C-alpha cells in the first residue's frame, strides 16, 4: 500500500473519533455585527452545542449524593428532556423510559474540573500541539484559550470515563494575565464551538508568583520580581479603567447624538448634529474592561497565602472580583479571609514541593479551607492524568481531613467536585447538583465514589448517555491511544 492512503486513513479515523453522538450542531445564523460599545460584552464565537435527543431515564434505588450536602439512600432519579425531573422514592417510570436498577450503586452530579488544559496542551505532548501560553508579553488578555483547543485530544475521552462532564479550559500561567478561559461540555465534537457551554461566562486567567517572573526575568524584562508582578497587574487595570471611561464617554455622546438626530424632523431637532468618533478598539483592554464590569470572571493562579491577600487588595483597588485562587497550596493560611471575601480556592489533594512557592503545602489544605462558614473549597486537576481520577483525589483530601479530626462525610466532600465549582463558574443554576430543574449531568458509580475501587459505570450529559462502561464506545479510539505499529513514514 502506498504511503499517502495510509496517511489519509489515519486522518479519517482521527476525525471519526470525534463525531457527535447523534445529529449535528445547528448552523449558526448569519452574523450581524453589533456596534462596539464598552457597555456590552462581545463573543463572536458563539456556542453551537445542542443536546442530543434522549429517552426518559429512571435510575432506581441508588445512594444519591446531591452535591449540595445531602445523602439520600435508596432513592430514584428521573431524567426527562435532558433535565432532572424528580428525585425521591418509588418514582413512576414514564412509558418507554430506560429504567436502570442502581441498587448498591451511587449517583452524583457530573464532575466539574475548574482548571484544565485539555485541548490546549493535548496528548501527545508535542511542541506543535502546545498552545496554552502566549509567551510574547506578560500581559495578553487579548488571547482566548478556546482558539487553541484541539477537540480531538484523547484526554477528553479519558476524563469522561472518570465522570467529568464539564471543564473550564484555561491558558497557562507564564503570563501575569494569560487570556480568556472557556467552559466546555465534555462531548465528542469536531469544533470547540460544538463543545462550548451555552451562556457560560468566560474567565480571565491571571497568575501571580514565580512563573511570570521566571519567564520574563530570564529575558531581562519585567516582571523579574514579585513587586514587578503587582506593578504589572495595576498598570494593566489602570489602563483598562481609562479605556472604559473613553468608551463610556462615547456611549453618552452617541446617545445624545441619536437623540438630536431623531428630533431632526421637528422644530427642536438639530439637523447639523455630528456623530461622535469612537475610541480605537483594543482587544487587550476589551477583556479587562469586561472584567471591571463583572462580565468576565477572574480565575487566578496563586500559591502563597500572602500573595492571595495582596491580590485581593489589588482587586479592591480597581473594583473587580477574583472568583477563585487556583492551586492555592497555602490557602489553609488564609482560609478565613477567603471565606469572608466569598472567594473560592481550587486545590490539589497532595501535590506540592516542586518549586519554592509550593514548599509549604499540607495534605489537610482542602479540608481546612472547607471548614469555615461560607467557604468554597474545590479540587482541580491541572493535569491530563489527574482528571481521570478526581474522585480518588478528593478521597485523599477527605481522608486527611478526617484524620485531622474534621467531620467530612461523602455528602460534604462531593461538593468540592460539583456545586462549588459550579458556583465559581456562575453555573450553579444549571449544573452541580441532583435537583429538579438542573441539567441532567449525572454519574452512576459502581460503589461509593470515594473508594479506591470506584468506577463510573454510566455518565450522562444533558440526559444523554455519554459513556457506558458496559458498552464500549461506538466511536473508534484515537490513534494516540491505539499506537501506530504499522505506520509508514513519508519521505
Question: Model regions: which residues?
Answer:
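Divalent metal-coordination and catalytic microenvironments
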Residues: 62, 77, 82, 104, ...
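C-terminal cap of metal-dependent C-N hydrolases
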Residues: 62, 423, 435-479
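N-terminal pre-domain segments of enzymes
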Residues: 19-54, 484-487
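C-terminal motif of bacterial Sec signal peptides marking the signal peptidase cleavage site
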Residues: 14-15
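Polyanionic/metal-chelating signatures
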Residues: 155, 160-326, 455, 461, ...
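His/Asp/Glu-enriched, well-ordered alpha-helical/loop segment
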Residues: 48, 53, 123-124, 130-136, ...
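Histidine-rich, glycine-flanked metal-binding segment
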Residues: 41-55, 64, 68-108, 125
Amino acid at each position: 500500500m502506498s504511503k499517502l492512503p495510509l496517511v489519509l486513513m489515519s486522518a479519517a479515523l482521527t476525525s471519526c473519533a470525534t463525531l457527535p453522538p447523534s445529529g449535528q450542531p445547528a448552523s449558526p445564523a448569519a452574523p450581524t455585527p453589533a456596534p462596539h460599545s464598552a457597555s456590552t460584552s462581545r463573543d463572536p464565537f458563539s456556542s453551537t452545542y445542542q443536546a442530543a435527543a434522549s429517552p426518559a431515564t429512571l435510575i432506581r434505588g441508588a445512594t444519591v449524593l446531591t452535591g449540595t450536602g445531602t445523602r439520600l439512600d435508596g432513592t430514584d432519579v428521573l431524567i426527562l428532556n435532558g433535565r432532572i425531573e424528580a428525585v425521591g422514592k418509588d418514582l413512576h417510570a414514564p412509558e418507554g423510559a430506560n429504567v436502570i436498577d442502581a441498587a448498591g450503586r451511587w449517583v452524583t452530579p457530573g464532575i466539574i474540573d475548574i482548571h484544565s488544559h485539555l485541548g490546549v496542551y493535548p496528548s501527545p505532548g508535542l511542541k506543535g500541539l502546545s498552545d496554552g501560553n502566549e509567551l510574547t508579553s506578560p500581559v495578553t488578555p487579548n488571547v482566548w484559550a478556546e482558539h487553541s483547543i484541539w477537540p480531538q485530544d484523547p484526554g477528553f475521552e479519558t476524563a469522561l470515563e472518570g465522570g467529568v462532564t464539564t471543564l473550564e479550559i484555561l491558558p497557562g500561567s507564564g503570563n501575569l494575565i494569560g487570556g480568556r478561559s472557556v467552559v466546555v461540555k465534555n462531548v465528542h465534537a469536531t469544533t470547540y464551538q460544538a463543545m462550548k457551554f451555552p451562556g457560560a461566562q468566560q474567565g480571565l486567567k491571571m497568575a501571580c508568583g514565580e512563573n511570570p517572573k521566571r519567564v520574563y526575568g530570564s529575558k531581562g524584562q519585567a516582571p523579574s520580581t514579585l513587586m514587578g508582578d503587582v506593578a504589572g497587574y495595576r498598570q494593566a487595570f489602570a489602563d483598562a479603567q481609562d479605556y472604559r471611561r473613553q468608551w463610556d464617554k462615547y456611549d453618552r455622546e452617541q446617545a445624545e447624538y441619536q437623540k438630536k438626530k431623531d428630533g431632526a424632523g421637528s422644530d427642536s431637532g438639530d439637523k447639523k448634529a455630528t456623530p461622535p468618533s469612537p475610541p480605537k478598539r483594543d482587544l487587550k483592554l476589551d477583556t479587562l474592561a469586561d472584567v471591571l464590569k463583572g462580565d468576565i470572571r477572574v480565575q487566578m493562579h496563586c500559591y502563597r497565602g500572602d500573595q492571595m491577600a495582596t491580590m485581593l487588595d489589588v482587586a479592591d483597588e480597581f473594583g473587580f472580583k477574583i472568583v477563585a485562587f487556583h492551586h492555592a497550596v497555602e490557602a489553609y493560611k488564609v482560609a478565613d479571609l477567603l471565606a469572608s471575601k466569598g472567594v473560592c480556592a481550587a486545590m490539589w489533594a497532595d501535590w506540592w514541593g516542586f518549586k519554592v512557592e509550593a514548599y509549604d503545602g499540607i495534605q489537610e489544605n482542602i479540608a481546612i479551607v472547607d471548614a469555615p462558614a461560607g467557604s468554597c473549597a474545590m479540587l482541580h486537576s491541572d493535569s491530563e492524568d489527574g482528571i481521570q481520577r478526581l474522585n480518588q483525589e478528593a478521597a485523599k483530601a477527605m481522608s486527611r481531613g478526617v484524620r485531622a479530626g474534621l467531620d467530612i462525610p461523602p455528602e460534604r466532600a462531593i461538593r468540592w467536585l460539583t456545586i462549588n465549582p459550579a458556583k465559581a463558574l456562575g453555573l450553579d443554576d444549571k449544573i452541580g447538583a441532583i435537583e429538579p430543574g438542573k441539567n441532567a449531568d449525572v454519574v452512576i458509580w459502581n460503589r461509593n465514589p470515594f473508594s479506591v475501587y470506584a468506577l463510573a459505570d454510566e455518565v450522562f450529559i444533558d440526559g444523554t448517555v455519554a459513556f457506558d462502561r458496559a458498552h464500549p464506545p461506538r466511536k473508534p479510539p484515537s490513534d494516540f491511544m491505539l499506537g501506530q505499529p504499522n505506520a509508514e513514514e513519508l519521505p
